[in-house]
Amino acid sequence: VKSPRFGLNRFDSRSVDAFAADVRRAEQLDWDAALQPDSQLRRRDTYVLLAAAARATERITLGPLLANPVNRHPTVTASSIATIDELAPGRVLLGWGVGDTAVRLAGLKPARVGELEAGTRLMRALLAGESVEVGAARPARLPHHRPVPVWIAAGGPKTLRMAGGVADGVFIRVGTHPANIATAVSAIRAGAVEAGRDPAAVKLAAIFHTVLVDEPARALTMARSMAAGYYEYSPALFDPPALPWTGPDPETLKHDRNIWPDFHHAPDLEASGKAVDFLPVEAADAFSLRGGTGEVAERLLGALRAAPAAFDYVVLHPIPDPKWPSDPDNDYTARIAREVLPQVRKELEKT
């Protein structure tokens, strides 16, 4: 099994300088990618942060994960990411999707699959230096175009299939269960074939919510909240692993238990996890890695070995959200880098 490049998507964003320093620390700890959410009502401007990180680093891959075509027009995003690539040549990617929390918090609706597809085609053309008809007096062109790959983050079958047909790569966001991952990879490959593309040319990545909590009961509770978050937006993901949902509708639970904005982003993940204590352990383990570093490493290896294809990137999304300032020697960034990644890389080299 090929070892993927490991990415992190949570950094100290209390200031621009703090973000740049934290990404530099991640690079020194041998993380491969630093990816930043584009959520304007929760965090500082993504591209200002990435520009600062580009100046402070030499090797690590940088990019948004994820942007969307609702909060920023695709031409704006293409211009911004091309500018970042000027600062970090050849180590930038653009990760985007329909938009969930960032869009909903602004009172807007996530993009439709067709809108995301059109935006992807537009951005890839602009970043390749092509002229594109956009309904203006003249075709649009990006003077400072750069060859930045456009990745789509997706979990639903329609979006995955579309992504296989138009994107440079796909961040699969369906949890850790092999049945869901296999279903996602099949959809991506089918979309590539339909579009006349070589399926092997579409790069693959995975996003794994990683509950790094040493106390087993707390880790399980938070993992249940992660499972509920997936069900909340994509209930069909419970079908391939044949998992039950025997509780009330997620929206009813959120209202009755004061869970906001959703099960993935609730400030108190133990409280939100207890609200779905009817979920079996199998559901918790189908949508996240959990436990101490030893357990996380074992579960991560299992997920990678069971996957039907090799991943170029694996993003280990920290749960719960790190608190800043943190202990730089013992926080999530350091513990995963020191106690998980070397072991996983070594084991994968053997196979």
What are these regions (language model features)?
Residues 47-67, 71, 126, 334-349:
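Alpha-helix-loop-beta-strand connector modules within alpha/beta enzyme cores
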Residues 4-17, 67-74, 145-155, 210-213, ...:
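Active-site mouth loops of central-metabolism enzymes
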Residues 33-56, 68, 100-103, 174-178, ...:
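Glycine-rich, proline-tolerant flexible connector loops at the mouths of alpha/beta enzymes
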Residues 14-26, 77-80, 154-162, 293-305:
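Short, acidic/polar
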Residues 1-65, 148:
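N-terminal beta1-alpha1-beta2 module of alpha/beta enzyme domains
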Residues 30, 53, 84, 123, ...:
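Conserved, mostly hydrophobic/aromatic
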Residues 4-10, 34-36, 61-65, 92-96, ...:
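Hydrophobic faces of well-ordered beta-strands that scaffold small-molecule active sites
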Residues 109-141, 181-309, 347-351:
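An alpha-helical appendage that flanks or caps ligand/catalytic pockets
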